[in-house]
Amino acid sequence: MVFDTEVYSNTGGQSSKSTPTGAIAQFAAGGKETKKKDMASIAMSYGYVYVAQISMGADFNQTVKAIAEAEAYPGPSLIIAYAPCINHGIKKGMAKAQTEEELAVKVGYWHNFRFNPAAEGNKFSLDSKAPSDGDYQAFLTVRFVTTL
């Protein structure tokens, strides 16, 4: 299980390989110039790794299903969990992290999915819905504000 905070959280929110392009973080005050490393795509490219992206605040049932499938899978499994960090500058604080997770999926920033190489038929399941009326740009604008 990888808790993807998109920064090095234990050192004050420094830019990492998981930080999205353009994000402002410590040591990337002008915005990160390189692309975020897509761990899920890398693992899926092997063809034999169970991979899921989850966001518990957006879909608790999908989270539980992904964890159960990963545990039952007879090979390596990788679950990447969207994990808001205090360094994101969540307006109402970390008490609203679950709401932030829900919003990330709602606006299309984060996608919940499962890739199960052992599944019959389609091995990839996109579990999140198409982005709805959320404001993607507003979601991005408030992230990483504490580093300014």
Region spans (language model):
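Glycine/aspartate-rich loop-and-adjacent alpha/beta segment that forms the canonical ThDP
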Residues: 57, 63-148
